[in-house]
């Protein structure tokens, strides 16, 4: 047992004993029969039909191919390829989509390496984009970016900030989600998909990270108990979100197209998982 595993077990024990609340324990008499699915084949037609849109994003990456070399081995606050948090296609797609769509506003829930790619695209494009980042402890330092663009950072959780803290988003704006990934009552995932997305107008570009659809989560992530992509699956199947790009699908099903373009020259570490999903909102729930 390694140190990280021991820490998780001690955290679970303290939670179950009621000493502290460091996670969630949900008793279920049939838990032993639960097997996480390897994938969701019923969703595959949606992804296959979206391949032309995925190809357009690869073409956009080609139009900004100079970043392949420019972000190689850089130092903060510049984005870099040599990290596993927001690797390869994730970073390239985020940069290219900001440069191409020129959003007036980006709201990011969960910040770090993704913020560096988004901010650099804003700066390189000479855009007047306003950025709001909500994260109690960003995975990568983003403090040095505030002097280069209109960037506001709320170092708190979405639960504590409240959904009212989010500014209004218009068609063409971006909502970038890389939060707790825990779909439980009251979590940031619950608030985002249950309260924020239902009132967004049509045409907002939404990003959700660590989404492997239509595949399941990696086996090595089983201990994390992520459930967010099940919520994303419902939004896709119901038509509330229309696919724009999916790193996992593109890397595993469009490998030839990736290899033929600039994205194929981006270094990706052996332990990295490319898992960005971009989609466009279809419109608000009536009356929201």
Language-model region placement:
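A short alpha-helical cap/connector motif
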Residues: 1-288
């Amino acid at each position: 047992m390694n140190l990280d595993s021991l820490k998780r077990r001690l955290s679970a024990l303290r939670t179950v004993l009621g000493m502290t609340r460091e996670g969630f324990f949900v008793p279920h008499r049939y838990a032993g029969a639960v097997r996480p699915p390897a994938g969701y084949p019923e969703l595959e037609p949606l992804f296959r039909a979206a391949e032309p849109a995925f190809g357009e994003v690869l073409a956009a990456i080609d139009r900004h191919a100079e970043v392949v070399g420019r972000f190689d081995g850089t130092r903060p606050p510049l984005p870099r390829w040599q990290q596993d948090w927001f690797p390869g296609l994730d970073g390239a797609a985020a940069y290219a989509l900001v440069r191409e769509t020129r959003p007036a506003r980006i709201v990011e829930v969960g910040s770090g390496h993704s913020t560096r790619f988004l901010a650099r695209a804003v700066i390189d494009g000479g855009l007047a984009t306003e950025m709001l980042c909500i994260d109690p402890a960003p995975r990568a330092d983003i403090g040095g970016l505030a002097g280069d663009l209109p960037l506001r950072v709320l170092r708190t959780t979405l639960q504590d900030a409240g959904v009212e803290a989010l500014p209004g988003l218009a068609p063409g704006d971006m909502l970038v989600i890389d939060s707790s990934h825990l779909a439980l009552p009251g979590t940031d995932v619950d608030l985002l998909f249950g309260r924020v997305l239902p009132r967004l107008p049509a045409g907002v570009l939404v990003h959700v990270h660590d989404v492997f659809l239509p595949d399941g989560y990696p086996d090595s992530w089983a201990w994390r108990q992520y459930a967010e992509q099940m919520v994303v699956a419902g939004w896709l199947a119901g038509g509330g979100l229309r696919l724009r790009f999916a790193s996992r699908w593109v890397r595993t099903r469009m490998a030839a197209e990736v290899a033929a373009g600039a994205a194929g020259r981006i270094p990706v570490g052996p332990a990295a998982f490319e898992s960005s999903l971009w989609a466009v909102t279809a419109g608000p729930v009536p009356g929201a």
